[in-house]
């Protein structure tokens, strides 16, 4: 009789321990720290980004990275809305220019907060949501997403 009670109590304890361990793994899988780095990161990654490679190639077919002015990527120095909007539109329209900007930002340790401020300056009405592709691509360049 005691053996049956001990076996059933052991089975209940093992079942309880495994079910609580499974719940913890679900929390660890779904709660990645990449989304907690910046306040708007979770919202930005949920939006769909549509890219059309044909139009981006038509906009700048003869782009030369050797002719770049490095200071054009300095988002911390941008204070005028028109300059920020111009840079954001250029980055949206040209993948090679955007990649060069991401490398420059990473080398100069530009934070996601600075990028978010720059994008909010570029489009005040939508609080930077218009240029989510730039923010998301920079996060992917830094390796902060699961892609």
UniProtKB/Swiss-Prot annotation:
One of its GO terms (biological process) is effector-mediated activation of plant hypersensitive response by symbiont. Residues 1-21 form the signal peptide. The record marks 47-48 as: Cleavage. The modification N6-acetyllysine is found at residue 48. Forms homodimers via the RxLR-dEER motif. Interacts with host E3 ligase CMPG1. Interacts with host DRP2. Induction: Expression is induced during host plant infection. The gene is Avr3a. The AVR3a protein of Phytophthora infestans is a polymorphic member of the RXLR class of cytoplasmic effectors with dual functions. AVR3a(KI) but not AVR3a(EM) activates innate immunity triggered by the potato resistance protein R3a and is a strong suppressor of the cell-death response induced by INF1 elicitin, a secreted P.infestans protein that has features of pathogen-associated molecular patterns. The 2 polymorphic residues between Avr3A(KI) and Avr3a(EM) are localized at positions 80 and 103, respectively. One of its GO terms (cellular component) is host cell cytoplasm. This is RxLR effector protein Avr3a. Proteolytically cleaved. The cleavage site directly after the RxLR sequence and the high conservation among other effector proteins suggest that the RxLR motif might play a crucial role in the intracellular processing before secretion. glycosylated. Belongs to the RxLR effector family. It comes from Phytophthora infestans (strain T30-4). The RxLR-dEER motif is required for the delivery of the effector to the host cell cytoplasm but does not bind phosphatidylinositol monophosphates. The motif is cleaved after the RxLR sequence. The RxLR motif (residues 44 to 47) plays a crucial role in the intracellular processing before secretion. The Glu-rich part localized just after the cleavage site (residues 48 to 59) is required for homodimerization. Its main location: secreted. Keywords: Acetylation, Glycoprotein, Host cytoplasm, Secreted, Signal, Virulence. The keyword Transcription does not apply. Multifunctional effector that can suppress host BAK1/SERK3-mediated immunity through at least two different pathways. Manipulates plant immunity by targeting and stabilizing host E3 ligase CMPG1. By preventing the normal 26S proteasome-dependent degradation of potato CMPG1, and thus potentially of its protein substrates in the host cell, Avr3a further abolishes host cell death during the biotrophic phase of infection. Also associates with and affects the function of the dynamin-related protein 2 (DRP2), a plant GTPase involved in immune receptor-mediated endocytosis. A motif (RxLR-dEER) lies at residues 44-59. It comes from the Eukaryota. Residues 77-147 are annotated as: Effector domain. It is found in: Secreted; Host cytoplasm.
């Amino acid at each position: 009789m005691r053996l049956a009670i001990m076996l059933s109590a052991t089975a209940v304890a093992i079942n309880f321990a495994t079910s609580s361990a499974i719940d913890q793994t679900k929390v660890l899988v779904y709660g990645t720290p990449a989304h907690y780095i910046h306040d708007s990161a979770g919202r930005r990654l949920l939006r769909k980004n549509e890219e059309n490679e044909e139009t981006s190639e038509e906009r700048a077919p003869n782009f030369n990275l050797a002719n770049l002015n490095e200071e054009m990527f300095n988002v911390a120095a941008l204070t005028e809305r028109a300059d920020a909007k111009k840079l954001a539109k250029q980055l949206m329209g040209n993948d090679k220019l955007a990649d060069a900007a991401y490398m420059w930002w990473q080398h100069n340790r530009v934070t996601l907060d600075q990028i978010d401020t720059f994008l909010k300056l570029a489009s005040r009405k939508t609080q930077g949501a218009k240029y989510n592709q730039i923010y998301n691509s920079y996060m992917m360049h830094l390796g902060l997403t699961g892609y």
